[in-house]
Regions:
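Non-catalytic propeptide/linker segments at domain boundaries
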Residues: 1-46, 53-55
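Soluble periplasmic/extracytoplasmic beta-strand elements of cell-envelope proteins
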Residues: 41-46, 125-130, 152-154, 207-211
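Solvent-exposed loop/turn segments at secondary-structure junctions
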Residues: 49-52, 90-94, 131-136, 158-161, ...
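Second-shell loop/turn segments in exported
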Residues: 53-64, 73, 95-104, 154-163, ...
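Catalytic-core regions of hydrolytic enzymes
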Residues: 57-140
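A short, glycine/acidic-enriched catalytic loop
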Residues: 135-164
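Active-site-adjacent substrate-binding region
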Residues: 165-190
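Active-site-adjacent mobile loop/cap segments within catalytic or ligand-binding domains
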Residues: 186-242
């Protein structure tokens, strides 16, 4: 993966000045997307914003989170001509301000998701980026001597028309299987009293919940995976536009 991209994401999040060093433009000029367009196509948010990964970059003394990963994926996509929004609002602050607790996080993310959806009708894909709670072995795959964080798609089945979300998610997972079969743990459907069962996916057919790695995954492994997920998203949006 591109270390420069990862470092730029991390420095942006902690408020440091971004390096003036030129990062090579890796965008694909043959894409069907209009790279001059300012209309966003992808919205990335983190319902559980503080979920952490392991920092194996000693240069930076910080704990990377799923929010770090969201910003990295944004950079990957924008270098492919896909304008992307990452939700910057503080989920914990929303919970505190509204006397809610961590279990109510989907109420908070729903508020910002609805705002983004209403304010940006051009959006084609909504990604709630999480990480799982897994051992490093269970969350990791090595392919061609590169270590990747495995992914899992989650679909809630406790609302009407969830099948549309399931079909959409399975179509993305199929692209992963066709191109990077080693990466995916599949699509998990959740329902019942002990789970959320909706995950705000009732707001759009094009909302996916993506688990990238686990609590023992390194941010480098996550970045390696997101490089490939960026390609998957390019292919999916290309199908939609085609």
């Amino acid at each position: 993966f591109n270390n420069n991209l990862l470092f730029e994401s991390i420095k942006e999040i902690i408020g440091e000045k971004v390096s003036d060093e030129e990062i090579p433009d890796e965008s694909n000029t043959d894409l069907v997307f209009n790279e001059q367009s300012n209309l966003p196509l992808v919205y990335i948010y983190n319902t559980h914003q503080t979920e952490e990964y392991i920092n194996n970059e000693p240069t930076y003394d910080l704990k990377p989170t799923v929010y770090t990963a969201a910003n990295y994926l944004k950079e990957v996509l924008e270098r492919q001509g896909i304008k992307t929004i990452v939700e910057e609002a503080n989920i914990k602050k929303y919970l505190d301000d509204n006397n809610l607790n961590y279990d109510d996080s989907y109420i908070a993310s729903r508020y910002y998701l609805e705002q983004a959806k209403n304010n940006n009708p051009s959006l084609k894909l909504f990604i709630d980026l999480h990480r799982d709670a897994l051992s490093h072995d269970a969350a990791t795959v090595i392919y061609n001597n590169i270590s990747y964080a495995k992914i899992l798609f989650v679909v809630g089945a406790d609302f009407n028309n969830y099948q549309k979300n399931l079909n959409f998610t399975e179509s993305i997972n199929k692209i992963v299987i066709d191109n990077y079969s080693f990466l995916t743990r599949g699509v998990l459907t959740k329902t019942g009293p002990l789970v959320n069962g909706v995950y705000n996916q009732d707001l759009s057919d094009n909302i996916i919940l993506l688990e990238v790695g686990g609590n023992e995954s390194t941010i480098n492994e996550v970045a390696n995976t997101l490089d490939l997920i960026g390609d998957v998203i390019v292919k999916k949006l290309g199908e939609e536009n085609g």
